[in-house]
């Protein structure tokens, strides 16, 4: 009975212990923004991975508190998956922060452009040209 419980607990921990992470499109988008210097780094992925060696550290750092408690209880076994969890969670947090920042910047630029058009500071042709430039600046592809 104890062996079954231990195997079930280990299987549960191994299947749920890691953060889901980003899909390939999100990774490409974040890499694009990082290359252009537009990414926001709220969490350091290297630090998240390093803290994963401590009991539950990677999960707690990545704001996965439930998994952090489980990994704390399963330490030292959790050092096999918690560094990956901390790294992936940090990247996910950075992706969300970057998306929010980029969208705010884009909206601000478009609002300023709309105000110029409404105030007759620019004509429709100039508005269209500048709007296209704003869209290109804040689009990942």
Predicted segments, located by residue:
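Membrane interfacial helix-start motif at the N-side
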Residues: 34-43, 54-67
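Hydrophobic alpha-helical segments, especially transmembrane helices
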Residues: 3-5, 60, 132
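Residues within alpha-helical transmembrane segments of multi-pass membrane proteins, especially transporters
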Residues: 13-15, 54, 58, 84
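Alpha-helical transmembrane segments of integral membrane proteins
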Residues: 4-8, 43, 47-51, 66-70
